[in-house]
Amino acid sequence: EVGQHQMWSAQFYKYKSPRQFLTSGGLGTMGYGLGASLGAKCAFPEKTVINIAGDGGFRMNMNELATASRNNIPIIEIIINNSVLGMVRQWQTLFYGKRYSNTVLDDGVDFVKLAEALGCVGYRAETKEEFSKALSTALTLNKPVVIDCRIGKDENVYPMVAPGEAISKAFDASDMK
């Protein structure tokens, strides 16, 4: 996966051992995560496999939930859903004068109903408490689960590097004031 959710996952999840974080890095592979998580679960059936995706990336290959259900592959898909292409919108905010173009995903797709229609379990979380409860329950199930986590469209991730700049020029939110 690629996007804000990828950076948050790298920054804030406490990994306990090597090879727990499968990532494409910054190669722009939206939608990579769901298929990769199915492969990881098949390779290591004894491991808990969780994919963290943005709602834009999830839409790229959401049909793979049918594969998970049909083949009884119990992965957990956490969707960080801000109803926009978050990283693209953040760049448009910071570097293009808030000229937003083609980033809004407000077509009303209900990821919980989609999960259920494809034979998976679906939960929606709008608070930390709802997320904790959904994740705790998902970890006890032996079936594919989708957790649709709603966040605000203006949540940004830092540090950030401007287009064409070197990594040494990375900046944080505090630099924006």
Specify the residue positions occupied by each region the protein language model found.
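Active-site diphosphate/adenylate-binding microenvironment
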Residues: 1-35, 40
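Short gly/pro/ser/thr-enriched loop/turn and capping motifs at secondary-structure boundaries
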Residues: 6-7, 28-30, 58-59, 83-87, ...
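Short acidic, glycine/serine/threonine-rich loops at helix termini
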Residues: 8-14, 33-35, 62-64, 87-92, ...
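Short glycine/proline- and charge-enriched loop/turn segments
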Residues: 15-20, 91-99, 166-168
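A short acidic, glycine-rich active-site loop
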Residues: 23-29, 97-106, 170-177
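Conserved thiamine diphosphate
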Residues: 43-134
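Glycine/aspartate-rich loop-and-adjacent alpha/beta segment that forms the canonical ThDP
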Residues: 128-177
